[in-house]
C-alpha cells in the first residue's frame, strides 16, 4: 500500500448535526490571524475540505472543522469551520462538538464539574463551559461572539414565489437571513425539506446579488452565508422551530448555534426577549438548544448582545483517512 496523505479526524454530532474534526495529518496552516489561516486553507489546502466533506468519505450535508494553533493568548486552540461549499467564520454546533471532543479525548485537561475552554474562530473568541459528570461531558454552553440585528424588514423579490418577501438580516457569527416560514408558504417539516433547500439557496444567492452587507469590525465578513427559516414549534417546551440552509443546499439537523445567536439578537432588539429570559429553539429533527442573552454590548454603531447557547454533543468515531495518489476521486466529488 502506498498513500500520499493520511488525515486524522474525530467524528461527532451535536443534536443531530455532524462535525468531522481534523486533529492531525495536514500541513501547517500559516497566518497571523484566524481569518488569515482561513484564507490560507482556501488557497493552499482546500483538498482537506473536499476530501473529507464530499463523497466518498463525506456527503452533501457533512460539516467539519480543523483544529489549529492560535496567536491569541486567551485561546486554548484555533478552529476553522468548513462544509461542502467552503469555510465559515463561526459555528455554534461545531463549537459545542469541538469542546466536547477536546475534553473527552484529553486535548484539554478535564475538570469536574466545569471545564472552561477558549477557542478562536475567524469571527472571534468563543468561550465554552463544558459540564462534566463522572468523566463524561453532559452538555456545553458557549458564549458566542457579539451578535446583532443588521437590517430589519428587508425586502426581496423571489422569482420562484412570484412575490416580495420580508425578512431580517442578523449576525450571530455569520450573517443570516431570518425568514418566517409563512412568508414562503411552507412549514418547517422534514416532509418539505426539498422545497426548503431550494428556496433557501435561491434566497441566499439573491440577497448577495441585491443587498450589501458588511460587518463593521471584521472586513472579511461581507456576505449572507445562511438562511434561517423559522416556524411555530412542534414541542411545547420550545419557543420557535427552525431550519437553516447553507453551503450547497445543506440542511442543519440541529437548531444551529450561530443561527440561535442571530435569532436572540433579533428578538432582543425588537423588544421580544429580555436579558436572561428562557429561549428554546427546536430543530427540524426535533432536537433543541437553549439560548439566553447574557448582556448588551456594541459592535460599531450597532446595538448588540452577548449570547449563550447550550446543547449536547457525542463522539461517533475516530478516523484515519488515507488518500491514494492513483485514485481519480481522491479529493472527493459531488453529484
From Swiss-Prot:
Inhibited by pyrrole-2-carboxylate in vitro. The active site is at 91 (proton acceptor), 256 (proton donor). Keywords: Isomerase. Pfam families: Pro_racemase (PF05544). The keyword Disulfide bond does not apply. Its EC number is 5.1.1.4. It comes from the Bacteria. InterPro entries: Pro_racemase_fam (IPR008794). It catalyses: L-proline = D-proline. One of its GO terms (molecular function) is 4-hydroxyproline epimerase activity. It is an enzyme of class 5 (isomerase). Differs from other amino acid racemases in that no requirement for pyridoxal phosphate could be shown. Belongs to the proline racemase family. Catalyzes the reversible interconversion of L- and D-proline. Likely functions as the proline racemase necessary for D-proline generation in order to discriminate it from the L-proline used for protein synthesis. NCBIfam families: PRK13969.1 (NF010576). This is Proline racemase. It comes from Acetoanaerobium sticklandii (strain ATCC 12662 / DSM 519 / JCM 1433 / CCUG 9281 / NCIMB 10654 / HF). The gene is prdF.
